[in-house]
Design a protein with these regions (language model features):
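Structural alpha-beta junctions
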Residues: 49-50, 101-105, 150, 278, ...
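Low-complexity, acidic/Ser/Thr- and charged residue-rich accessory regions of DNA metabolism proteins
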Residues: 2, 244-311
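Soluble or luminal CAZymes and related metallo-dependent hydrolases
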Residues: 33-37, 87, 113-114, 241, ...
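Extended two-metal-dependent nuclease catalytic cores across DNA- and RNA-processing enzymes
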Residues: 2, 78-260, 304-305
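Hydrophobic, Leu/Ile/Phe/Ala-enriched alpha-helical segments that form helix-helix packing faces
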Residues: 42-46, 99, 125, 277
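Non-catalytic, usually N-terminal nucleic-acid engagement modules in DNA/RNA processing proteins
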Residues: 1-72
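Short glycine-rich phosphate-binding loop at a beta-alpha junction
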Residues: 7, 52-59, 105-109, 132-136, ...
Length: 311
């Protein structure tokens, strides 16, 4: 039985690494910020949590269904001035290959968002009765998945562990209220507008009082903060944009888990990884003897713990 699985929101890691290590280049001068940064972070978290299975999920296209409702959905990410999309995509291909050579299970569907695929992977692992599922991401959207004891959202930067028991402490709302909270305050990173003049405190107070937006809309009480008619319209739009469960239920056939090279359980290949390091001047990975051993040990744990293949 797989006791612990790590799921990496790989694009989230890539964006951070792309900017954090922006001075890194190979011998020809090509940027290698994400090529270096993503394996660096993944190895640190694998060493920290000692999982039996590691899955890195990469973003594809923005959801066509969400774009119909909100044409500017995630538009700000596309329009960043300090962002070289062509170079980012080049590095993304190399990162997927590098992680694969380390024995990391890589998921990528060019037509789907990572959030939706991560939701599907979580449901798959829960069906396989995996003991603990840890999602590595700083994206607050994933807090909505921490409604059962087996799911943990870990932010490697703040080091917060969001669970069904800790979400209220860290965020001021219950994990099950995440979608309603984001509906009220909006999400700037995704270009989703919330209810006018409702910020974090007002949203937390609203949810503390009413429990949920649905409960408020069904009740007879009138709020001085929000109008029921206006909130009803915003809720209908934002709930679909934000709720991974709602999207999954409506478009489940569209969300396919595509394993990189059709291999859900790749085997670490030291020779290929050394070639990867040589091609991109990643000498530190080769000098640190423990780096590759982290993934070799992961592979051994994975083989011992798996009884049924994921498909």
């Amino acid at each position: 039985m797989v006791e612990t699985a790590l799921i990496f929101d790989a694009n989230n890691l890539m964006y951070r690494a792309y900017h954090r290590f922006n001075s890194f280049t190979d011998v020809s001068g090509r940027p290698t910020s994400a090529i270096y940064g993503v394996p660096f972070v993944v190895e640190a978290q694998v060493r920290k949590f000692q999982p039996d299975l590691v899955i890195a999920v990469f973003d594809g296209a923005r959801s066509k269904h969400r774009l119909k409702i909100c044409p500017d959905y995630k538009g700000s990410r596309v329009q960043k001035l300090d962002f070289d999309k062509e170079d980012f995509l080049r590095q993304k291909e190399e990162v997927m290959e590098g992680l694969y050579n380390l024995g990391v299970s890589v998921v990528h569907n060019p037509d789907q968002e990572a959030d939706d695929m991560i939701y599907s992977v979580v449901k798959l692992l829960q069906k396989q009765r995996v003991g603990t599922i840890i999602i590595i991401s700083s994206d607050k959207d994933f807090n909505q998945l921490a409604t059962t004891k087996d799911v943990v959202i870990y932010n490697p930067h703040s080091q917060e562990k969001i669970t069904v028991n800790t979400c209220k402490h860290f965020k001021g709302y219950e994990a099950k209220q995440t979608v309603d909270y984001l509906t009220l305050v909006g999400d700037d990173s995704d270009n989703i507008k919330g209810y006018p003049l409702v910020g974090e405190k007002r949203a937390q107070q609203f949810l503390e009082k009413y429990g949920s937006i649905k409960a408020f809309l069904r009740g007879s009480e009138i709020s001085s903060v929000v109008s029921k008619n206006a909130l009803q319209k915003i809720y209908k739009k934002n709930h679909f944009l934000i709720s991974l469960r709602a999207y999954h239920l409506k478009y489940m056939r569209d969300v396919k888990i595509n394993w990189y090279k059709n291999q859900p359980f790749p085997t670490p290949n030291k020779s290929l990884f050394e070639n990867y390091c040589g091609a991109f001047t990643l000498k530190s990975f080769l000098k640190d003897k423990g780096f590759y051993e982290t993934f070799k040990s992961l592979s051994q744990r994975s083989i011992r713990s798996r009884k049924n293949n994921l498909s």
